[in-house]
């Protein structure tokens, strides 16, 4: 009965999110595999040269642009972080993070799932040039994790899906904080003040409930540039922009007009093809329905497929390719061990222990419909770090520490693969065990 209530509580938005993210995760995985194959084939020189190709335009003696790799990591990934920011804002206002009672359990789980992997990595790499990579195993890739859960289907309780999504959203928020605090260097305060000025204008637009997305996006480009120049990673600008996008629906609701249009359409005669009148009515319905959506919903709906089926797969293809040959030094400090143990051991232990202790201390309450063994299974799947871990590895290790970056990427792929396989087998066995007991 509790599971039925939980399933009914799962909003349509959340269900669509599960679907898009899970299929996006499969596509993401295929691109990561393709990158590894190409990076270790006769095409490897062309593959690595491609990402250093400059793209932009020349103005006199000045070149305005970036390498293809920077376009992906700094510009396209900003759109991905914009979508993450929109998701976080929605969950904070209306979703599973909207109240302390709802949010406390997954948020504490996310904190434990970030601290434990970070500590394991740092302990193994303390006092080495690679210690700065402690943020790498802290992240969870929700697309991959949900892809695994969707493959398991009904064997996974709906309540566990909700918990994992909420945990991943809180984890994303934590990763953003980690990037802002620990992977920011050489701050330029003049540019930072410029960014704050843009944020102030965005806040005024939000306060006035300006519903057109155009001024927000134009100011967002300016904010991105200021933040990029300030020394803070530019993707943080996208998250700030997301929090400034209005979420209120219009007061002059179009419901009555939609009903009237629906009645008009029902009264028209049906044929093989739509008549001109029917096309006009449907076009009006589409416009009125769009007007009912908040700017946040419209932007999120627009970005979801672009992010899931273009930006993330392209990021995976550009970053997952590592040439594994005799020249690579797998013994760079303890990077390989730190990342793999952080993802495969630190994530499940951190999530399980901190939630178990917090419930015993009556700080939080476990969601109905899932047991402690389910929480451990979610912890195993949370060890699939891939996308965000790859992103943080690019920030943690510069070109001067290329060996560590390459080893970290191999470790992320191995750790994520191990976590995904063990997590899937574990939840499958858990379901079988429950079925036998019945």
Curated annotation (Swiss-Prot):
InterPro entries: Na/H_antiporter_dom_sf, NhaA. One of its GO terms (biological process) is regulation of pH. The chain crosses the membrane at residues 23-43, 62-82, 104-124, 133-153, 162-182, 185-205, 212-232, 302-322, 337-357, 372-392, 410-430. It comes from the Bacteria. Gene3D superfamilies: Na+/H+ antiporter like domain. Pfam families: Na_H_antiport_1 (PF06965). It is found in: Cell inner membrane. It catalyses: Na(+)(in) + 2 H(+)(out) = Na(+)(out) + 2 H(+)(in). One of its GO terms (molecular function) is sodium:proton antiporter activity. GO terms for cellular component: plasma membrane. Keywords: Antiport, Cell inner membrane, Cell membrane, Ion transport, Membrane, Sodium, Sodium transport, Transmembrane, Transmembrane helix, Transport. It is a multi-pass membrane protein. NCBIfam families: NhaA (TIGR00773), PRK14856.1 (NF011428). Belongs to the NhaA Na(+)/H(+) (TC 2.A.33) antiporter family. Na(+)/H(+) antiporter that extrudes sodium in exchange for external protons. HAMAP family: NhaA (MF_01844). This is Na(+)/H(+) antiporter NhaA. The gene is nhaA.
